[in-house]
């Protein structure tokens, strides 16, 4: 692991992709047959705001060099994804054990019994795992508990009382390209060069 992406490098644009390789064929009768051959992971295309080497890009260049192309992993917290749309603010935990492959997860510890404790599209992680999951249905709690539907299916088992992280979500990722280019897009009136950087990362499983 080679650290956390510099917080001073603010995003200008963000593209989110979900990768899930699927083989599809059809029977003689025309019925679709499908199977998935590897695990889902997220991918991002990110463009960093224009800035000078002295205030953003010096630190950013050094960080990217430390990654040694795709060799190292690092954490990144995309601003549009790191916090939930829901209203939950309490410590939420897994209720009971769950096995790999589950998509419905029992949780308890919700702060109140109302709708939209979590919202569809919110991201969560579980203690002991780095994989990020997306909640795919709005969550209403009852008796401070609820069943949450996630995608992709769990990669590994969950223990009872494992804590759920739903704010300040960190994705563990790696660069996907061997060549990383910092482009000069202009200069200030004082002659300082202005850089811009666009890069792709993929979630590391």
Go through each PLM region and give its residues:
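Extracellular/virion structural assembly segments
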Residues: 1-205
């Amino acid at each position: 692991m080679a650290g956390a992406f510099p917080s001073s490098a603010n995003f200008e644009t963000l593209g989110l992709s979900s990768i899930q390789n699927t083989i599809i064929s059809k029977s003689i009768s025309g019925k679709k047959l499908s199977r998935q051959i590897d695990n889902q992971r997220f991918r991002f295309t990110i463009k960093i705001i224009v800035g000078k080497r002295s205030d953003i890009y010096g630190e950013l260049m050094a960080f990217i060099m430390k990654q040694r192309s795709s060799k190292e992993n690092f954490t990144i917290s995309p601003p549009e994804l790191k916090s939930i749309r829901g209203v939950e603010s309490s410590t939420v935990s897994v209720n009971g054990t769950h096995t790999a492959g589950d998509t419905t997860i029992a949780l308890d510890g919700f702060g109140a019994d109302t709708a939209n404790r979590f919202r569809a599209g919110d991201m969560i992680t579980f203690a002991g795992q780095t994989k990020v999951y997306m909640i795919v249905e709005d969550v209403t709690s009852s008796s401070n508990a609820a069943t949450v539907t996630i995608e992709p299916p769990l990669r590994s088992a969950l223990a009872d009382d494992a804590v759920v992280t739903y704010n300040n979500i960190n994705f563990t990722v790696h660069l996907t390209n061997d060549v990383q280019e910092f482009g000069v897009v202009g200069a200030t009136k004082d002659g300082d060069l202005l850089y811009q950087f666009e890069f792709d990362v993929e979630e590391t499983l």
